[in-house]
Amino acid sequence: MKRLFCKKVLGGFALVLMGAFVAVPAAMAADVAGANISGFVDVSYSDADNSNSTFSLDQVEIDIEKDLSDKLSIRVDVNHLPDTALVFDDLIEQGYLTVKLDNIGTGLDVTLGKFNAPIGFELLDPVDMYQYSHALVFDNGLPTNLTGVMGAYKVSDMIDVAAYAVNGWDNSSDNNQSKTIGGRVGMNAMPGVNVGVSLITGTNETTTVDKRTVLDIDATITMIDNLTIGVEYNSGTEENANLTSDGDGEWTAFLLMGHYDLDDTYGVTARYDTFDDEHGSRLGNSVVEKQTALTLAGTMSLGDGAGLLAEWRRLDSNQNVFNGSTEDSTDTFAVEFTYSF
């Protein structure tokens, strides 16, 4: 089964490479052999006061979607990040089958494979972001991808639910006997207000049965024309992960973002986020600390799928954890160009 899936993925990738020699209208997905092909290129320049400045090819991604029937579809996201090895797990950001069971209520969608974690406000890909960087809660309080099975059901026009059983946080193959389980309830509370409540819990280590549990609440508010407001609250525990004494490691995080489109071309963004690593278990610095970030960005649409943004980000800690543990703050400036098709 694994070999068959690999052949399908590689076959699709070969099809994409062949399609690269065919003219494709800008900012439009290609349709080749019944498959919808889209993707993006992400390049940047960044300068941090505690490290070198650099130009970077950050990501190249090609997404392949195909309906095999009215009840079965597949999707594969082939994604290369230059800093990762050319191994299967790194190349395939997502790869899954979706089965539509229309005879169950309003319709149950069952997804099997590797998929982006349905939790939190921010999304993974840069073309879906208003800033160059992700917030602290995205980087430290949430999984990125999950591998397993997920069911999604639309209860009504106002409520949808999803539940899943997976191999753990960002594990394509499980490293223990237990499965991580989770779910999300999405609510369209009123026009222009969408709220999601997510819970995920399970074992993520090979040598222990200690569980990591996270409650995450996110909201997207678009009640005012041209203004998008994002809010997220995250609370997590990991059993026996307290670095200061016996007990569980705990953390809380918060995000508030606002983006305003000045017109069809220009936009401005501000984001404030915090991460309180109460027992030193999540930020990776082996100390109890609280980090706070302020991010300001300007966006510009260049048309035909092209976009440009400039970002300044100030990251502060109540401990000296930057520049070789000698400073408690760091500033980063970045310019990013993306092209999606």
Positions of PLM-derived features:
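C-terminal closing repeat unit and adjoining cap/tail of repeat-based domains
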Residues: T295-R313, S317-Q319
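Outer membrane beta-barrel
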Residues: A30-D170, Q177-G182, G186-V195, M257-L262, ...
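Outer-membrane beta-barrel "beta-signal"
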Residues: V185, M300-L302, E327-F341
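Cleavable N-terminal export/targeting peptides
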Residues: M1-V32
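Mature soluble domains of exported/periplasmic/lumenal proteins and thiol-rich metal-chelating peptides
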Residues: D63, V321-N323, Y339
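Outer-membrane beta-barrel domain signature
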Residues: A48-N52, D83-F88, L136-L142, D170-N176, ...
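Detector for outer-membrane/organellar transmembrane beta-barrel domains
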Residues: M158-I159, S178, G183-T292
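Flexible, surface-exposed loop regions and adjacent strand-edge segments
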Residues: S56, V127-S133, K179-I181, G249, ...
